[in-house]
Regions:
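N-terminal and secondary-structure boundary signal
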Residues: 9-244
Length: 244
């Protein structure tokens, strides 16, 4: 059954799954078609367990050979790693460095003093400064992306609020989840399928955690490259990848 929602909130519901507006349900990768079936949940907070959330919303929908993908932000939120802006006091260095970060419509990243401050704390001042220097050299050569290659996944996963962020996270900085492989394994044991923790946005992404070393992370980056969970107020922090 398909049901339409009015205006910018229009989505299509097929059974218990959601295909978010502007996203395709299926994608072809290396000659194989995959469904990306998003799952709507309540607003997750640090009072929730990601395992309990997955058991409640995803487990009843899982079929054989499915893979559950979970956004890293919601895992971090469950771990208490959504830090209120009011609790972050950026140092002068954070304010200075944030001015050189490219702002995009897909997320503020480290382009605000508070997110850069958290990058300095999470990754270390020396490493961030080294990454910034390498990035500046890369830009002279016409190359982008060198900063995150040096700073690493912890820095890449940090994000700040934007106009469409769901409260209370519209006033928080989101940090990378701790121990994503272990989290993926714990969820997998609870729901009975492969699980990955993703850091995907409308510019690309990474797989931060996987429940098995046999999972092809590069393949799932291709399958999820158009960010089917969305980048706005969709409230779909997890989904199922299923071979058609």
């Amino acid at each position: 059954m398909m049901v339409g929602f009015p205006g910018k909130f229009r989505r299509y519901i097929m059974e218990e799954y959601i295909v978010n507006k502007g996203k395709n349900e299926t994608i072809e990768v290396d000659g194989i078609n995959y469904q990306r079936l998003c799952i709507k949940t309540h607003i997750i907070t640090d009072k929730d367990s990601i395992v309990d959330v997955a058991v409640k919303y995803a487990k009843p929908l899982i079929k054989e050979n499915d893979t559950l993908f979970i956004t890293e932000k919601i895992v971090g939120c469950c771990q208490g790693r959504a830090i209120p802006l009011s609790e972050i006091k950026p140092r002068k260095l954070a304010t200075f460095l944030s001015k050189f970060v490219l702002k995009t419509p897909y997320g503020i990243g480290l382009a605000m003093p508070e997110t850069m401050e958290m990058a300095l704390r999470e990754v270390g001042t020396i490493k961030i400064l080294f990454a910034a220097g390498i990035s500046a050299f890369g830009k002279v050569l016409g190359q982008r992306g060198w900063f995150y290659k040096i700073a690493g996944e912890k820095a890449r996963a940090i994000d700040g609020p934007c106009d469409c962020t769901i409260p209370p996270y519209n006033e928080c900085v989101s940090l990378a989840p701790l121990n994503p492989d272990e989290v993926a394994t714990e969820v997998s044991n609870a729901i009975g399928c492969d699980v990955i923790i993703t850091d995907i946005n409308d510019l690309g992404g990474n797989i931060l955690g996987a429940s098995s070393p046999k999972i092809d992370r590069d393949l799932f980056v291709k399958i999820l490259k158009d960010n089917p969970l969305g980048q706005s107020d969709e409230q779909t922090p997890m989904g199922i990848v299923r071979v058609c």
